[in-house]
């Protein structure tokens, strides 16, 4: 274990040293000394030296405005480098990676050792594997793309430096390159000056595909195939690619007025353009590689006399011409030119697949399997995974927008006001119209801009090549009519196929009603005919936690899934649960393997569909090797969950969860909604007001510009509490509820739940992780610097609650200290705290100065504002999850 850490530690200190030299060259010895002093004080403050903690606070309070930015940047950049070293560590032979691709092998061995599972059953489970990762542009991806590229290169240098056999001159060359990269990062502004547009966000997503997934996915499939051959003597069929990528960037318009129908149309074209670009590079390689002459009669018939001399090349060159023509047409469309579609325009995956697969079959038949299974196989798998659209997109819109559009329409038609009808009347109207052959939208109707936007979006979906849009997600879905309304709007737009429409249930009440809503829908004959035995439902993690606290929300999510699984099973419907998880614990984030095994039995039968949030995309898919490791983890977890499902919880456990849920929700809402001091305390003790100024994502932080906590999006709500280290949304209410159940004499039952029920043990594990990242002395310091004295008692009360909560969680989990079973994560948090603490202290100081200036009617000092932005980004890097 310790060897593992020492490799990580030595890389971290080496990168820190290079950063120090860079700072000295850029700003002189005195700034470096300042930074070093602060680092040493922080280290001994962490070790429990109170005098040094006091000195740390004084030193940071007394920095001049000129010193603020360099000090903030030094610690922030250091944390980015530490994260890079840790990311490398997770794939390095000395680090975690020694164990990750092995996940699949370990899972297969575990499954083979179960007497009740035949090899055939395991094969069938592999064949029905389905993993769809939905990339979302979260404003929380704070790091700029420019810096991400540099960090990828730093990673490559670390990898080469690990090679024991490199010559001295190579070692010196690599160190020089590292110095250059770290200097480039230091002299680059880490904060974006402008908010990214939705198109910028989509380009960020394409960059992830190009830099990592394009190579990572075929590598993962080779790894999977190797393990299956070794353990089951089973070869993956060429056409079997269980992983797909979808994106919300450019498709998610919920609360984001910047994502319009035109933007979605543009992103769809851009995505296809990027796909032609990447496939052209692949085909170029194949043109030079596939110079073979021998071919099957089928292939020769396909190429005719003209191509007989070099049949494979001939087909590849043809495909290359089609790709080039397609790319040129897409480029013209992106510039706004209207051109007729060229001969051979590629719109469907089959058009890419057929010539490539014909070559593959011919090479195999002619004894050239070794060639067929090289680059050609990788390209075939990319066609299955990415294809013509590159990534498909989801459209997401809030339910009320559809209701308002239909209300405006029915008023215009003089048949009443749809918005004020009862649910039964709405359903009757919708089903009648869905069954009708005549159009509903009048020709000369001029709807309002909002309604026009909803109709235009449906038009874009109807015109897009089939297969480029994956699903229509309805946020804040509450009733069956919410789902039927979207089907009607799509029908009116002339859509020619059954588009999956997924209701998203995201508040406590909506989760509790989810099963009723779906049961009603499945009882409608027209609806059953439309969906052809398949239904997708999305479970919202972040909004339900913000609404009711984590304990109540996670139990509601579990119960909703459990009920939906049983209802769909009874109705013979294949259910795909779509999980809207975030990177942070308050938004449902948990280590993948634990999270999947803690879901109700049967929840992964229809495959896994899950959102991957901005900042987590980089940690999980930032490099091809990490992609292989993340996909392997998911694969192992899905196989295990489907073949060895977790137990059904005992009735007594369910009753305890009901009780925990009620107590924790009451306490959580008692503070967040009913305590009149809470909102003023939240606004002053966290950088919530200042966060709005950060040019992070393309969507506004609030659903409505005025309003309290409930109008704040889930992301800034959690982000703000992560910054001041109280981490409140991720624990408030949970420990108090546990304590109450312990006092009722049920501790041994809770211990049994922790031991034998993955759902419950994952809950507790996530609480431990949050407590390990929280820091009460820092939260208290924010209060002293920023909060009105009258509100101090509330802060004290919340901190005392957290201390009590930690005790009860440790007692139930039977641990002496936090994260006892995950020492690697505990180590990583400790390593970063030394650098995150000064940023927290500095942030409190900067907020104090900035608010003081505002109070006195002065413009805030730009140096203070800039340094504040840097601390926000730095703490996010230190906490490894933002919102």
Swiss-Prot record:
UniProt keywords, alphabetically: Carbon dioxide fixation, Lyase, Magnesium
Recorded GO CC terms: cytosol
Stored SUPFAM superfamilies: Phosphoenolpyruvate/pyruvate domain
Record Pfam families: PEPcase (PF00311)
Segments traversing the membrane: none
GO molecular function: magnesium ion binding; phosphoenolpyruvate carboxylase activity
EC nos: 4.1.1.31
Catalytic activity: oxaloacetate + phosphate = phosphoenolpyruvate + hydrogencarbonate
Keyword Magnesium found: yes
Cofactor(s) essential for the protein: Mg(2+)
Residues forming the catalytic site: 138, 546
Matching InterPro entries: PEP_COase (IPR021135), PEP_COase_bac/pln-type (IPR022805), PEP_COase_Lys_AS (IPR018129), PEPCASE_His_AS (IPR033129), Pyrv/PenolPyrv_kinase-like_dom (IPR015813)
Swiss-Prot/TrEMBL GO biological process terms: carbon fixation; oxaloacetate metabolic process; tricarboxylic acid cycle
NCBIfam families: PRK00009.1
Function: Forms oxaloacetate, a four-carbon dicarboxylic acid source for the tricarboxylic acid cycle.
Recorded family membership: Belongs to the PEPCase type 1 family.
Name of the protein: Phosphoenolpyruvate carboxylase
Protein encoded by which gene: ppc
């Amino acid at each position: 274990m310790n060897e593992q850490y020492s490799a990580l530690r030595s890389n971290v200190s080496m990168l820190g040293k290079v950063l120090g030299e860079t700072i000295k060259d850029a700003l002189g010895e005195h700034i470096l000394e300042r930074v070093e002093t602060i680092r040493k004080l922080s280290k001994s403050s962490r070790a429990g030296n109170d005098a040094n903690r006091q000195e740390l606070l004084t030193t940071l309070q007394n920095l001049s405005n000129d010193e603020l930015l360099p000090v903030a940047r030094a610690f922030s950049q250091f944390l980015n480098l530490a994260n890079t070293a840790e990311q490398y560590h997770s794939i390095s032979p000395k680090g975690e990676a020694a164990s990750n691709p092995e996940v699949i092998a370990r899972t297969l061995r575990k499954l083979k050792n179960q007497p009740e599972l035949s090899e055939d059953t395991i094969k069938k489970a592999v064949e029905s594997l389905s993993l769809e990762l939905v990339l979302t542009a979260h404003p929380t991806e704070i790091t700029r793309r420019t810096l991400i590229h540099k960090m990828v290169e730093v990673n490559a240098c670390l990898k080469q430096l690990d090679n024991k056999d490199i010559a001295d001159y190579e070692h010196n060359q690599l160190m020089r390159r590292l110095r250059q990269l770290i200097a480039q990062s230091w002299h680059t502004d880490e904060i974006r000056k402008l908010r990214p547009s939705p198109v910028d966000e989509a380009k960020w997503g394409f960059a992830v595909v190009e830099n990592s997934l394009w190579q990572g996915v075929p590598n993962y499939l080779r790894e999977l195939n190797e393990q299956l051959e070794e353990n089951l003597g089973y070869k993956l069929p060429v056409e079997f690619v269980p992983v797909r990528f979808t994106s919300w960037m450019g498709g998610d318009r919920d609360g984001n007025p910047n994502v319009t129908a035109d933007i979605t149309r543009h992103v769809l074209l851009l995505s296809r353009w990027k796909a032609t670009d990447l496939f052209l590079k692949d085909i170029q390689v194949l043109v030079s590689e596939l110079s073979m002459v021998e071919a099957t009669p089928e292939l020769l018939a396909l190429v005719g006399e003209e191509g007989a001399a070099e049949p494979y090349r001939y087909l590849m060159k043809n495909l290359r011409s089609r790709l080039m023509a397609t790319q040129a047409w897409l480029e013209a469309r992106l510039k706004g030119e209207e051109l007729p579609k060229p001969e051979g325009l590629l719109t469907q995956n089959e058009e890419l697949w057929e010539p490539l697969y014909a070559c593959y079959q011919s090479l195999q038949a002619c004894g050239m399997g070794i060639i067929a299974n090289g680059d050609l196989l990788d390209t075939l798998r990319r066609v299955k995974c990415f294809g013509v659209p590159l990534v498909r997109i989801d459209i997401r819109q809030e339910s009320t927008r559809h209701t308002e559009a239909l209300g405006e329409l029915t008023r215009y038609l003089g048949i009443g006001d749809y918005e004020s009808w009862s649910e039964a009347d709405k359903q009757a109207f919708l089903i009648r119209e869905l069954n009708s052959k005549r159009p509903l939208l009048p020709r000369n109707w001029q709807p309002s801009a909002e309604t026009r936007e909803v109709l235009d979006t449906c038009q874009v979906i109807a015109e897009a090549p089939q297969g480029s849009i994956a699903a229509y997600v309805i946020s804040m879905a509450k009733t069956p009519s919410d789902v039927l309304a979207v089907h009607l709007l799509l029908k009116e737009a002339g859509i020619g196929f059954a588009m999956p429409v997924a209701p998203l249930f995201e508040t406590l009440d909506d989760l509790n009603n989810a099963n009723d809503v779906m049961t009603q829908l499945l009882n409608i004959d027209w609806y059953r005919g439309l969906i052809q035995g398949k239904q997708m439902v999305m479970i919202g993690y972040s909004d339900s936690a913000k609404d009711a606290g984590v304990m109540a929300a996670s139990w509601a999510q579990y119960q909703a899934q459990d009920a939906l699984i049983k209802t769909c099973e009874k109705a013979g419907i294949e259910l795909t649960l779509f999980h809207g998880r975030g990177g942070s614990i308050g938004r449902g984030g948990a280590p993948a393997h634990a999270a999947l095994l803690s879901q109700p039995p049967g929840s992964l039968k229809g495959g896994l569909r899950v959102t991957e949030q901005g900042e987590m995309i980089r940690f999980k898919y930032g490099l091809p090797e990490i992609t292989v490791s993340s996909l392997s983890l998911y694969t192992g977890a899905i196989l295990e969950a489907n073949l060895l499902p977790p137990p059904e919880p005992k009735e007594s456990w369910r009753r305890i969860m009901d009780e925990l849920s009620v107590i924790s929700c009451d306490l959580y809402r008692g503070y967040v909604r009913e305590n009149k001091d809470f909102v003023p305390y939240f606004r002053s003790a966290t950088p919530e007001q200042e966060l709005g100024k950060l040019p992070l994502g393309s969507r506004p932080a609030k659903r409505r510009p005025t309003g309290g906590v409930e109008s704040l999006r889930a992301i800034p709500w959690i982000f703000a509490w992560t910054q001041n280290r109280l981490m409140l949304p991720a624990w408030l209410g949970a420990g108090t509820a546990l304590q109450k159940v312990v006092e009722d004499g049920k501790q041994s039952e809770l211990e049994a739940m922790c031991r034998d029920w993955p759902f419950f043990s994952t809950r507790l594990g996530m609480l431990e992780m949050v407590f390990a990242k929280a820091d009460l002395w820092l939260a208290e310091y924010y209060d002293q610097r920023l909060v009105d004295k009258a509100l101090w008692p509330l802060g004290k009360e919340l901190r005392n609650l957290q201390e009590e909560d930690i005790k009860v969680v440790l007692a139930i989990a039977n641990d002496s200290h936090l994260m006892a079973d995950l020492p690697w994560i505990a180590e990583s948090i400790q390593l970063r705290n030394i650098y995150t603490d000064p940023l927290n202290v500095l942030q409190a100081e900067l907020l104090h100065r900035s608010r003081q200036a505002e109070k006195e009617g002065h413009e805030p000092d730009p140096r203070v504002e800039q340094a504040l932005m840097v601390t926000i980004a730095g703490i996010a890097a230190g906490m490894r999850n933002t919102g």
